[in-house]
Each structure stands twice: as structure tokens, then as C-alpha cells.
Design a protein with these regions (language model features):
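Alpha-helical transmembrane segments and their membrane-interface exit regions
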Residues: 2, 30-31, 52-55, 137-143
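Voltage-sensor/pore transmembrane module of 6-TM cation channels
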Residues: 1-15
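Juxtamembrane membrane-interface segments at transmembrane alpha-helix termini
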Residues: 6, 32-41, 59, 123-127, ...
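Short alpha-helical "patches" and their helix-cap loops
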Residues: 24, 47-48, 133-134, 146-155
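Aromatic-enriched
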Residues: 141-230
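Hydrophobic/aromatic-rich transmembrane helices and adjacent perimembrane loops
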Residues: 127-141
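Membrane-embedded alpha-helical segments of multi-pass membrane proteins
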Residues: 3, 24, 89, 132-136, ...
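Primarily membrane-embedded glycan-assembly and transfer machineries that use lipid-linked glycans
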Residues: 13-130, 178-187, 210-230
Length: 230
């Protein structure tokens, strides 16, 4: 799962340098230990992953795999490097969105974006992995400062993911590859909406709302610095 890596990167670029560096070093150390203990399987796993499929799970196409790679596989008929590249792009997109929102003072919202990004970008993200929608929904309900379109889209996304209507679709035995356009839309809609929320968050950060929020945070930090000096 990409959650630790995405959260580490988010911490680093959001200004929490020490937390980000410690997390990244821990990741490298654990990965190195894995190679030392299981050199062959580790080499096979990462080598196959670079081609778009780790080979450890045959269910990438399954309807409840709500990841970018899952969507790519259902649309294209197979997991491939293109899906992996798209997943990396979404990871970068989500990281940018989270950092921008953090700098706008929306820390809880930013952390939820980072968590959801890790699920969208992971090769396998079963629908029950989406526990991030719980704090995400709470933040959206309580936070009146966020742009209304982000709150509405985010709450709808949380409800859609929680009820998971795509589970009503036929599944197993790669039947997902034969879905009609409407079935395909229902199955992939949550991922589309999740990516749209990431894009919408970046757009919001560059609107007057975002600029005002960053300016307010800068004044707040400067005020705290002056208070600390006195």
C-alpha cells in the first residue's frame, strides 16, 4: 500500500521535513531488509510491478478494485505500464493538492486528500480499504470555510463510496471486461470523482479563496513568530 509513502511525501513537502525524512528512511530500510531476506521474490515483485502488474493478485480487474489501475485494466482489457504511469501521475496530482491545501490552512482536509490519493494510486484498493472517507466526510461536514463545490462533491463522493453501488454489478471470471458502457461508468465513477476532487482542490488553491487563505496563514505565522520573539 502507498499510504505510508504518500503521507511521508506530504509531510516533507508541507513543511514537516523531519517527519517526512524519517518516514522515507524507514521505508528504504524496510525495503532493503526485504531484499536481503527474500532477494528473489523481491526482485520478481518489483520487476513485474514496473510492467504494470505485480503478479501477486489476479483481481486487478475485479469490480471492487477502486484504483486508477483497476479502471485502466477494465477499460483497456489488461494491466499494463500505461496504467502504472497514470497511477503515478494521479499520485503526484494528489500530493500537489494536499500540499496546497495544507498551505491554505486546511490541514485536516489536506491529510484526507493524501490518504485518498494513496488509495487511488495503489494497484489494488478494494472498496473496504476506503476508510479515509470517514474522516473526509466529517471534515467536509464541519468545515464551512471550504469552497461549496468541494464540499458538495466530497460529500457525494463519501456517500457513493460508502454505499458502493458498483457492488450490485455482476462480477468474477473477468466479466468486468464485458461491461456495457453504463455498467462501466457505475463501476469506475468513484475513481473518476476522486480524481476530479483532487483537480478541484488544486484549482481552488489558485482562486481568490486560496490566495486569501494562504495570505491569512502567512500573517498568522508571522504573528506567532513576533509573539515568540517578544
Amino acid at each position: 500500500k502507498l499510504t505510508p509513502a504518500l503521507i511521508a511525501a506530504y509531510n516533507f513537502f508541507a513543511g514537516k521535513r523531519k517527519a517526512g525524512i524519517v518516514s522515507f528512511i524507514t521505508f528504504l530500510a524496510c525495503t532493503a531488509i526485504g531484499f536481503v531476506v527474500l532477494w528473489g521474490p523481491s526482485l520478481t515483485y518489483f520487476g513485474m510491478l514496473l510492467s504494470g502488474d505485480s503478479g501477486l493478485n489476479s483481481g486487478i480487474v475485479f469490480k471492487t478494485n477502486q484504483s486508477v489501475l483497476g479502471v485502466w485494466t477494465r477499460l483497456m482489457g489488461e494491466a499494463s505500464r500505461g496504467g502504472l504511469v497514470l497511477s503515478v501521475l494521479v499520485a503526484v496530482l494528489g500530493l500537489v493538492a494536499a500540499v496546497l491545501m495544507h498551505r491554505a490552512g486546511e490541514v485536516a482536509y489536506a491529510l484526507c486528500l493524501a490518504g485518498l490519493t494513496s488509495l487511488l494510486a495503489s494497484p489494488i484498493s478494494w472498496s473496504h480499504h476506503y476508510v479515509w472517507i470517514v474522516p473526509f466526510g466529517i471534515v467536509l461536514l464541519r468545515n464551512q470555510r471550504l469552497p461549496e463545490y468541494l464540499r458538495i462533491a466530497g460529500l457525494f463522493y463519501s456517500i457513493w463510496t460508502a454505499f458502493a453501488p458498483f457492488k450490485l454489478l455482476p462480477g468474477d471470471n473477468n466479466v468486468e471486461l464485458t461491461y456495457a458502457p453504463l455498467h462501466m461508468l457505475v463501476d469506475n465513477f468513484g475513481v473518476y470523482l476522486g480524481v476530479a476532487i483532487l483537480i478541484g482542490s488544486i484549482v481552488a488553491a489558485y482562486t481568490p479563496w486560496g490566495r486569501d487563505r494562504r495570505r491569512a496563514q502567512l500573517h498568522l505565522r508571522n504573528g506567532e513568530a513576533i509573539t515568540a520573539e517578544t
